[in-house]
From Swiss-Prot:
Organism: Rickettsia typhi (strain ATCC VR-144 / Wilmington)
Stretches assigned to coiled coil: none
Compartment(s): Cytoplasm
Protein name: Lipoyl synthase
CDD domains, per the entry: Radical_SAM
Length: 297
């Protein structure tokens, strides 16, 4: 086991300093958009923003949940901004994005959990940037009747919802969520709109056992999930859940090999893998792998 008191060399990244990084930062600030890159203190922000790739966080910057792994602010959220979908579409245009990733905080205070706001954002982008592919990373819409239908009908190219961790750790790491609700959400999106690629991710290093990770893989395939991401959990602050283990690159390769035997179209498993890391390139690979599988049937 790697010493958890300091981050190993394979986790360290260079500080962002490119002109493209600052251009992206300024544009996001000027359009008054939130990003999960900043709010969740993502280690890949320098690389992604230098490539003009940012994951926009809609529905405000305050979450109604308090997951032990997440750095996003929690509390009473702001009122919905009706102009946010238009500003988001403007940012996509100005950044000339081929692929955009949209995520959000949890909004348990809203009747549909924010599903219709996601749909409005998708529609605005489709109108102004019809060639841009759209990936959404949503909350679980727990006890929000009709939300899954709204999302499925909005037809994103990729629907992502993260299970985050193994079921045995939900009470301590993700107490406001339900593992089987997350699986059901993923399964129902695929059932309602089979043409949408589905994706889910989890963190390791929180104390889970290998056999539990493998069971999550099986559960996700049972839900017809196409793409699995696995990355190292990093503690945002001392008040968050502790890192129990730094999983080595070799162990990540082992997990990737196992996952590939399960039938996923795509697997990304590295210490720095995050849900939207290299999402644009991965979407192209996802389509290629789908076409290869289709041709072999």
């Amino acid at each position: 086991m790697t010493n958890v008191n300091r981050r190993p060399d394979w986790i360290k990244v260079k500080a962002p300093n490119s002109a493209e990084y600052y251009n992206t930062k300024d544009l996001i600030k000027n359009l008054r958009l939130n990003t999960v890159c900043e709010e969740a203190a993502c280690p890949n922000i320098g690389e992604c923003w230098s490539r003009k790739h940012a994951t926009v966080m809609i529905l405000g910057s305050v979450c109604t949940r308090a997951c032990r792994f997440c750095n996003v602010k929690t509390g009473r959220p702001d009122l919905l901004d009706p102009h946010e979908p238009r500003r988001l579409a403007e940012a996509v245009q100005k950044l000339n994005l081929n692929h955009v990733v949209i995520t959000s905080v949890d909004r348990d205070d809203l009747e549909d959990g924010g599903a219709s706001h996601f749909a409005e954002c998708i529609n605005e982008i489709r109108r102004s940037s019809p060639n841009t592919t759209i990936e959404i990373l949503t909350p679980d819409f727990l006890r929000k009747a009709g939300a899954v239908e709204v999302i499925a009908n909005s037809k994103p190219d990729v629907f992502n919802h993260n299970v985050e961790t193994v079921p045995s750790l939900y009470k301590t790491i993700r107490p406001g969520a339900r593992y089987y609700n997350s699986l059901s959400l993923l399964h129902n999106i695929k059932k309602l709109s089979p043409e949408i690629f589905t994706k889910s991710g989890m963190m390791v290093g929180l104390g889970e056992e290998i056999n539990e990770v493998v069971q999550v893989m099986d559960d996700l395939r049972e839900a017809n999930v196409d793409f699995l991401t696995i990355g190292q959990y990093l503690q945002p602050t001392k008040s968050h859940a502790e890192v129990i283990k730094y999983v080595t690159p070799e162990e990540f390769k082992y997990l990737e090999r196992i996952a590939k035997t399960k039938g996923f179209l795509m697997v990304s498993a590295t210490p720095l893998t995050r849900s939207s890391y290299h999402a644009d390139k991965d979407f192209q690979k996802l389509k290629e792998n789908y076409n290869i599988r289709l041709a072999s049937m």
